[in-house]
């Protein structure tokens, strides 16, 4: 978190910070990202497709396996969730639906525009993208040579703004009591 980053900056020059960041998971934009930008710290983003949510693989919260539905985007009543929060499933899946609609309008895959949005963000140096098959790899690679017009970047940001606001500044995906100092 921002406090841990501040402590580390007093001890050493920090070059990169590895954090979860994607269209649905934007809490780092509140405090951590501005601090990284101020100190020239590059961001390595993990979970850039929100564990597959941004691929359009899941049409509703009920389709998401327990192991993937334990983040604060989902109800704290899910079997493996430990955060104890209400979750924001309705807002999350409304945003996913709107992202898919925009991708269809652009005749692109939602994963491609989601990765391109993330690449467009200030301070991003790398995305840690996983692929379970050659087909997923073929889908992800073109996103690194694809740029979105600013108007589409702004639309995507707007689509997920309510999710961002409900999550607040707690960048901990799994715990409602922010363990990230």
Q: What are the language-model segments listed below?
A:
Residues 5, 29-36, 115, 153:
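Short amphipathic alpha-helical segments and helix-helix/interface helices
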Residues 12-15, 39-41, 46, 123-125:
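Short, well-ordered coil/turn segments that N-cap beta-strands
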